[in-house]
Regions:
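Active-site diphosphate/adenylate-binding microenvironment
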Residues: 21-30, 358-432, 438, 444
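Phosphate/pyrophosphate-binding active-site segments
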Residues: 141-144, 167, 182, 309-400, ...
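N-terminal alpha/beta PP-like core and its mobile active-site loop of ThDP/TPP-dependent enzymes
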Residues: 2-344, 385, 389-392, 472-475, ...
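Active-site phosphate/pyrophosphate-handling residues
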Residues: 51, 381, 464
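Conserved structured core elements
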Residues: 12, 227, 234, 274, ...
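Short, internal active-site loops enriched in acidic
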Residues: 172-175, 403, 557
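Thiamine diphosphate
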Residues: 107-120, 267, 318-319, 326-327, ...
Length: 598
């Protein structure tokens, strides 16, 4: 409660709230403390520990890591249910504070309910599973330990370079104990996220490399959001005439009508941006960890003279693939690098080529996403219908499956900050839980979640959460009969359809799920539609609704936009089918272009 943060010059709570599911491991002591302080620190009831934590993570991303939710559970399954969410936060460099209950520090009642026992090490508990997926972990076995532990956790979560989840496991017997804490520990403290400046030498070296390039591109990542560097990115691109591509996490850091906007790059990118990547002799990566879907598993950059400049607040990310590192805040670094470049700019023909290819690709996407006479619509047709009837400020949310790549091609940003995804861990069911957190952070905006039937069936309880907390979502359920995108990969690798689509699984009692009725049972308004025209009308009704609105529609399981980048996904070394042989051939072609460093 005493922890505050400056956001745009205004003092705000660092911790806006707690998501909690109480059990014997946290209800009697921590639960009572939360009840007694609910006006200053509200607690929101969860319905699944993973989901409530994902909601907190979605909130933190939408708030650009400036506010942090707490997630608390009991010991045992409640705690381990949050492990997946911790992985989401860890891989996406997002803050959340986990406070799981733990076993007794004094061990007198061992084994307690839900305790896992390690015969060779009684100090290990289920909460040790948090260690690989948190930036900071501690177990409180004495009450005075929190004097050092909590400030350390906070500084980790607020550190722009080391940001990630923190876990402080609270032993049950210690939660209720007293200690004569110093008054200073409870005094208000105001935080501000630091903006480290880059080293002058690194700026100089980066500027020299850029000046020697002829066809540079920018790769804009999620760090541009967290640094609030969208204006600086725009100014840099215009001044130095450099096309801007975007990662999935950096999508909507630039608007579609910007003179240097190029679109999505890499495995989910368009042919236009991947053509730029093949030809570029230098990429300026800004705030991106350069994941495989961004780089085409490092096979996208085919120019033998290719060089990489990486602007990143994290030393670890900035130095990847022998890049010329610029270790610093994106906003500050772009300004200083621009000063070092002076009046230098790339040739006019390069960005003209980028815009020409973008126009051609957009026309192809528009044609694919337009309504047609086919009986079952494709993903892009569904997304196109929603996009056509949406407002520029509406926020699209995706996470797993084929919808992520289709949305970034169709949902071309008309305003900044209008696309949110979870593509670090690609966690199924984040589409609903994360969308709820994004809505809580943006109560005045429409939040539209695109989700497949596979993700929906995996976890959907936050439809109910959104209803009872008055956080309206629009959820578009695309039912293509199973895990269609992995079925696509299975076929691409030369395999036979097996255990992905429902029809190719062991399902003798197969029935269709009525997603609309299921959502309705949780208090949402809902309807099933059978065509794109019906979808458009349903979406208009959803926009007018004051409660969560779920629209389900059958979608094509085999129809996708064409991919144009390599992805290093394993292939059988010894083929067993003719299809395997073709897959191996394509795999070897891609591997032959993969860079060993830069």
């Amino acid at each position: 409660i005493a922890q505050k943060i400056l956001i745009n010059g205004k003092k705000e709570p660092l911790f806006p709230g707690v998501f909690g599911i109480f059990g014997h491991g946290n209800v009697a002591c921590l639960g009572q403390a939360l009840e007694e302080n609910q006006k200053e620190l509200p607690t929101y009831r969860g319905h699944h520990e993973q989901n409530m934590a994902l909601t907190g993570i979605g909130y933190a991303r939408a708030k650009r890591r400036q506010q942090i939710f707490v997630a608390t559970s009991s010991v045992g399954p409640g705690a381990t249910n949050m492990i997946t969410a911790a992985g989401v936060a860890m891989s996406n460099r997002l803050p959340i504070l986990f406070l799981p209950g733990d076993t007794y520090a004094n061990r007198m009642p061992d084994p307690v309910l839900q305790q896992v026992e390690h015969f060779n090490n009684p100090g290990i508990t289920a909460n040790d599973a948090f260690k690989p997926v948190t930036r900071y972990f501690d177990r409180i076995t004495r009450p005075e330990q929190i004097i050092q532990s909590f400030p350390s956790a906070i500084q980790t979560m607020l550190d722009p370079a080391d940001c990630g989840p923190a876990c402080i496991a609270l032993c049950q017997d210690i939660q209720g104990q007293t200690f004569d804490y110093p008054e200073e520990f409870f005094k208000e403290r105001v935080h501000a996220i630091r903006r480290p400046r880059p080293d002058e030498f690194q700026i100089k070296e980066a500027a020299e490399k850029i000046k020697s390039s002829k066809n540079p591109i920018i790769i804009s990542g999620g760090g541009v959001f967290y640094s609030d560097a969208m204006d600086e990115l725009s100014n840099f691109a215009i001044k130095h005439n450099i096309p801007v591509t975007q990662t999935v996490m950096g999508y909507s850091t630039m608007k579609r009508d910007h003179s240097h906007y190029a679109g999505q790059i890499g495995g989910l990118g368009g042919r236009n941006t991947n053509n730029l990547a093949k030809q570029t002799d230098l990429a300026i990566a800004v705030g991106t960890k350069l994941a495989d879907f961004t780089t085409g598993s490092w096979a996208n950059f085919e120019n033998e003279n290719f060089k990489l400049v990486s602007i990143n607040v994290s030393r670890f990310d900035a130095n990847k693939h022998l890049a010329q590192a610029v270790i610093g805040d994106a906003k500050v670094s772009l300004n200083e690098l621009s000063l070092a470049l002076g009046n230098w700019k790339a040739g006019e023909e390069w960005n003209k080529k980028s815009q020409t290819e973008l126009k051609s690709w957009n026309e192809e996407v528009d044609k694919a996403s337009a309504p047609s006479n086919q009986e079952i619509p494709s993903y892009v047709q569904v997304i196109g219908a929603v996009y056509k009837n949406s407002d520029p400020s509406d926020i699209a949310v995706t996470a797993a499956g084929g919808l992520v790549g289709e949305v970034v091609q169709v949902w071309r940003p008309r305003e900044l900050n209008t696309h949110e995804t979870e593509w670090g861990f690609s966690c199924m069911s984040y589409e609903i839980s994360g969308a709820l957190g994004i809505k809580m952070a943006n109560p005045d905006k429409e939040v539209i979640s695109f989700i497949g039937d596979g993700s929906y069936l995996m976890n959907n309880t936050d439809i109910y959460s959104s209803v009872i907390t008055n956080n309206k979502l629009i959820i578009v359920v695309c039912d293509n009969g199973g895990f269609a995108v992995i079925n696509r990969l299975q076929l691409f690798k030369g395999g036979k359809e097996y255990n992905n689509l429902l029809k190719s699984s062991k399902t003798p009692g197969l029935v269709d799920v009525d997603f609309a009725k299921h959502a309705e049972s949780m208090g949402a308004k809902s309807e099933h539609v059978n065509s794109i025209s019906e979808l458009e009308e349903a979406f208009k009704r959803a926009k007018k609704s004051d409660v969560t609105y779920v629209i389900s529609i059958k979608t094509h399981a085999y129809q996708w936009l064409e991919g144009s980048a390599f992805w290093d996904s394993p292939t059988l070394e010894i083929p067993t089918t003719e299809e395997n042989k073709e897959a191996i051939k394509l795999y070897k072609e891609g591997k032959s272009k993969q860079r060993q460093g830069v």
